[in-house]
Amino acid sequence: MARNKPIAKKLRLAKAAKQNRRIPVWVIVKTNRKVLTHPKRRYWRRTKLKE
């Protein structure tokens, strides 16, 4: 990817990177392990972003 990115694209990529985290441990504890996975989790090779 180019080093000189437009700021809007850089912000979108940063937002996607922040969203791409696992769910917190306290959520697992609070829900008695009913919620374990994050349905919108994205793996960089499988699912690409719209840029």
Swiss-Prot record:
What are the record's GO terms for cellular component? cytosolic large ribosomal subunit
- Keyword Ribonucleoprotein found: yes
The record's section on InterPro entries has:
Ribosomal_eL39 (IPR000077), Ribosomal_eL39_CS (IPR020083), Ribosomal_eL39_dom_sf (IPR023626)
Out of the domains of life, which is the source? Archaea
Give the Pfam families listed for this entry: Ribosomal_L39 (PF00832)
Q: Name one GO biological process term.
A: translation
Q: Which keywords belong to this entry?
A: Ribonucleoprotein, Ribosomal protein
- MF terms (GO), sorted A to Z: structural constituent of ribosome
HAMAP family cross-referenced by the UniProt entry: Ribosomal_eL39
Q: Which family does it belong to?
A: Belongs to the eukaryotic ribosomal protein eL39 family.
Q: Which NCBIfam families match?
A: PRK01242.1
User: Could you identify this protein by its name?
Assistant: Large ribosomal subunit protein eL39
Q: Which organism is it from?
A: Thermococcus sibiricus (strain DSM 12597 / MM 739)
